[in-house]
Amino acid sequence: MKIKCSKSNLVKGVSIVSKAVPSKTTMPILECILIDATTDIIKLTANDMELGIQTEISGDIIDRGMIAIDAKIFSEIVRKLPDNEVTIETLDNLQTVITCEKAKFDIAGKPGDEFAYLPIIEKEDSIEISQFTLKEVIRQTIFSISDSESNKLMTGELFDISDNILKVVSLDGHRISIRKVPLKKSVADRKLVVPGKTLIEISKILSGEAENVVSISYTKNHIVFEFDNTIVVSRLIEGEYFRIDQMLSNDYETKVRINKKELLNCIDRATLLVKEGDKKPIIINIGDELMELKIKSQIGSMNEEIMITKEGKDLLIGFNPKFLIDALRVIDDEEVTIYLMNAKAPCFIKDDGESYIYLILPVNFNAAA
């Protein structure tokens, strides 16, 4: 095999597929990136058997062939080459020569046919959304997944396709995040649980342009994202996702309309008095036109008042400040509406059209104070 391409194209391609290289594996071939020049297109692939990424890069194929190269070494070499044309050539003994200007590297390769190719997916159905929308949906929900492997379903996000709407749900036992996106074409109802790791890595690759589309197709076991000459194939998480509909009540005793930035900044200031790992709640006292926020820790105490518009009853309630901050940070609206029932029931932050819903459980601030 012998190919030529620009350093910038190679760096971009390697950066994309490297996200599917496992940090630990018992199969050395999976620590490699496959360079496939057996057709008229140069393809780079990495695969950890749960997540696989393939991307095409432009360049010249002089001799067809393929080779697998250690991803870490290859990535570091490519990144530090001069900004010029790169030639990659494999010899009969699988030694791979990488040259750029006067720099020349000679490294060992592995047979390309030993590499774990991406599974060929018989696509059952597909949806299309813009890269901008998918990137935003991930940003606005991913913080609510659990990092505990003890409950695998909580480490993923539910993609619930129903009535021409994609509803994305994440939860960790303390909060639920929901984003709804209307779909342009009619597809059959389907529920898929996508690993959080997959979505985090996809979010890093997406350009985020509104005019660029992502095609999302799926089977019983896999989901495929196709965009910008890149294919991402991921295993789905098995099992039935949690039923949350009974938790999403529209009833409330107190409704608060408040400036999002003011509330976020106030809670952010309050957390200055909380050490990492210290579970001190922020206590919120809702009155007629004012919301008072208080926090007390070993470091000190703080209280602040914010103007609000309120409907319904006064309320005293406590929350983990981090959970409020996480939700408020990803809401783009200037004002937010918060719905509350009592000090023991979850609060809901949502817009009028319910394109986003954030459910956050309160904490017992008497016991925690």
Question: Where in this protein do the model-derived segments appear?
Answer:
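Structural preference for solvent-exposed beta-strand-turn elements
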Residues: 1-369
